[in-house]
Amino acid sequence: MPSLLLLFTAALLSSWAQLLTDANSWWSLALNPVQRPEMFIIGAQPVCSQLPGLSPGQRKLCQLYQEHMAYIGEGAKTGIKECQHQFRQRRWNCSTVDNASVFGRVMQIGSRETAFTYAVSAAGVVNAISRACREGELSTCGCSRTARPKDLPRDWLWGGCGDNVEYGYRFAKEFVDAREREKNFAKGSEEQGRVLMNLQNNEAGRRAVYKMADVACKCHGVSGSCSLKTCWLQLAEFRKVGDRLKEKYDSAAAMRVTRKGRLELVNSRFTQPTPEDLVYVDPSPDYCLRNESTGSLGTQGRLCNKTSEGMDGCELMCCGRGYNQFKSVQVERCHCKFHWCCFVKCKKCTEIVDQYICK
């Protein structure tokens, strides 16, 4: 009997440990920024053990790639900011709630919103690491070594210092996916389905950055004649990556896990998702009202647009509860004039405008 009690206690502690690990995330590096590599002078292991939100596998990578951690934090921050931009006019607006779990319990639901968040965060890491390589901030990588594109004109030079998206992609895959790959759930279980969903969306985010990187060129020549061009590989603006992933969010595929431990479409009539598509396994929670169990913050107190018929409109944003009107003073630059030479001088104008918030 005592041995059975010990086994039960051990299993319970293991379950709690897993829940605690899942509640925290490497995303917290965005809210608890890692200082520049000088912080590691005191030794890698103590610092890596103190960083919040890392899984065991991610801590090992931290110890091996100390100088990368600040840029992983930058990537997470970039992803979170882009998420908040893309969803600024939605009921769920990608709000951060604390420094450990970052987004709170809402990420424990395998919804479309969770799918987007995983994708855009992984994309942020690829973006940050790729740029850091080009800027010479990391000792393990440098400028891009991508082969010369076949369609590049012969008289154009290939060899500028490009963003190292190949390295950024590989490192982001190793680091971000480490948390999911070290989990061991029963084949065909809901938990395994969630792991597969996370891995799919991580990959979709990385591929968005990788696929959207393009050739950039600079002209050389007398008086801007552009008789010669030097070209290199350059990352797309991250806003464009966010726009692409938002399109993928809108067309995300509903999936379920099979007994064989694979994801399949809930509706087989739909097109099978590619590695560049987002997938989800749970319906979205009700974001209208605050709900501690789902992590929904509700829309009470959110600004809305009285004249819009879209998701930012008061009717939809406030979920039919109505809204309150208030006056707001806005200060803007106005009556700007150019003065020779060379500056622009503006006045400050105040305007009282009507604004609306959800009840």
Swiss-Prot record:
Keyword S-adenosyl-L-methionine: no
Residues with a covalently attached lipid (O-palmitoleoyl serine): S223
SMART domains: WNT1 (SM00097)
Sites where a glycan is attached: N93, N99, N291, N305
GO molecular function: cytokine activity; frizzled binding; signaling receptor binding
Assembly with partners or alone: Interacts with PORCN.
Keyword terms, alphabetized: Developmental protein, Disulfide bond, Extracellular matrix, Glycoprotein, Lipoprotein, Secreted, Signal, Wnt signaling pathway
Protein name, UniProt field: Protein Wnt-5b
GO terms under biological process: canonical Wnt signaling pathway; cell fate commitment; chondrocyte differentiation; muscle cell differentiation; negative regulation of canonical Wnt signaling pathway; neuron differentiation; positive regulation of cell migration; positive regulation of convergent extension involved in gastrulation
Subcellular location field: Secreted, Extracellular space, Extracellular matrix
Role description: Ligand for members of the frizzled family of seven transmembrane receptors. Probable developmental protein. May be a signaling molecule which affects the development of discrete regions of tissues. Is likely to signal over only few cell diameters.
Signal peptide annotation: 1-17
Disulfide links within the chain: C83-C94, C133-C141, C143-C161, C217-C231, C219-C226, C288-C319, C304-C314, C318-C358, C334-C349, C336-C346, C341-C342
InterPro entries recorded: Wnt, Wnt_C, Wnt_CS
Keyword Zinc part of the UniProt annotation: no
